[in-house]
């Protein structure tokens, strides 16, 4: 028998990673408020329009991505040479690591962070340096900058955070970009949740003002294309030229490209989503207030609620028994007792509030 540890890269062999297929297969019959997907209802006529645009060649031929690049660049107000499409934002991160990160390099993130930043660092035998968020849950930019060393290649700021929904101001990011540029360090701004609040991002201007800024985006969240896997890297032409070298031969599939073009043809849906999510936040928080459950609004398509464990049983487990899924428990001590809940429609929230009310009553009877 061969010794896999002699063949598999050291960083890969010594990284533990769970198989999530079973978990995902069990979500079908639940209210899915766990992964920050767009769970709002899609108009049937719009979906039929997408289906009618599919052709046999989209399955049999290799992807021609010229049109989707043109349309995406136009939508973003960037040039095609400032853009790389990727198979979800996961592959955008991998593209950065493949091009930039070597054994012993450092990547600085704020904690909590998107888990793929840690996995790709481990595979490369690089060091991930997590800096806990401050008391206000904002990234501690001063502490992050103070952690920069000669080994630091990348500093990552999620704007907003996909875990707790906070983000620095544009001016703070601009100042950080300027300081990191002097240290020859990339600033990666992860905007996976952009478009939840509005359609404008001043951060795009930073890719031209500074030579060290890269922005990551995805169509998985607000655009509702999590299953299509469409992400992107945006940067100045010099950076993109280098990152483009490590792309797959075909960045995304023909079906993913068609889904992206279909969504870009209906950008009015973004405004409708923003309005619906904004109203949903207000209504859900009002419902939580009636149950005396503390909550925090966020810059993302989710809210955070406070519900400490009861007799060693956590809220995730309790709600799962009511066929409602929410985000998993935070590991950071300062966030213990808080839970992330994706925003859905009125029916989703009614079932969530009903389940929370029942759980509260059960706890009171026990106590």
Tell what function each PLM region has.
Residues 2-88, 95, 363:
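N-terminal small-domain helix-loop-helix segment of the aminotransferase-like
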Residues 282-307, 328-337, 367:
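Conserved small-domain helix->loop->beta segment predominantly found in fold-type I
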Residues 79-83, 103-106, 151, 184, ...:
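Short acidic capping loops at alpha-helix termini that bridge into adjacent secondary structure
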Residues 278, 290-322, 345:
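Conserved PLP-binding catalytic core of the aspartate aminotransferase-like
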Residues 212-289, 293-296:
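PLP-dependent aminotransferase class I/II
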Residues 135-198:
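Active-site phosphate-binding strand-loop segment of PLP-dependent enzymes
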Residues 321-322, 331-367:
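PLP-dependent enzyme catalytic core of the Aspartate aminotransferase-like
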Residues 99-157:
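PLP-dependent aminotransferase-like
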